[in-house]
Amino acid sequence: MDHLMLRPVYKVKNLDTLNNIYHSYYRKITTGIKFFVFKKGPLAVGASYLCGFIKSDHHLETPNLQFHVSPASTDFLGKTTLHNFPAFTPTITNLRPTSRGTVEIQSPDTRIAPKIQMNYLSTDEDKEMACKAIKITRNIVMNSKAFKKYEPEELRPGIHIIDNGTLAKEAGKYANTIFHPVSTCRMGNDEMAVVNDKLVAHDLENLRIVDASIMPHITSGNTNAPTVMIAEKAADMIIEDSKS
């Protein structure tokens, strides 16, 4: 399992974004100096300037969508440069996906990479939630007073796309992992489980797995803090076992 981030992009006016800085040689230099001398400016901030959790339906007890907002935009993360116009990306993620991927061993030779199939947006529930998430984002950006002075224009997927089938397909074209893969060595006692409740691998001795892969299900949020907690719990269990 993994969290998939949908990446709608909005062009704006009357607003400076990281796109402007990236395409200005002078501003890149001054931005670098500002960071090295004062530890301030865009380089002192992470990739997301704003994070928030919301509910796709007010009947839900807890939020099921997460925003990561970046004052920059690009076509594909890590493959293309920032756009040459001011824009921002209100990335939104379904925190409870139902799509399941697979990891299959291809050979006894450890030098042969496994076959990894992520299967993003492979269920009707995830496709429906992707459409709902995009429409919620669109409503916030296009209809709220806070954004009005910036005259937002939906560059991607495009304000004209309202059909759910087309919207889910377009949203998936530019989606990316948010780097939360879990559950490949999940804890449990069924035939698909890899470790027991002590994090010891089934049918093996002296082998524990201590990372996000042991989670039976993905968490409704970032996975780093829960993984640290898993490690701390595992450390306690290892110490306790060493005494016996």
Feature roles, as predicted:
Residues 148-159:
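Short, glycine/acidic-rich hinge or "gate" loops at secondary-structure transitions
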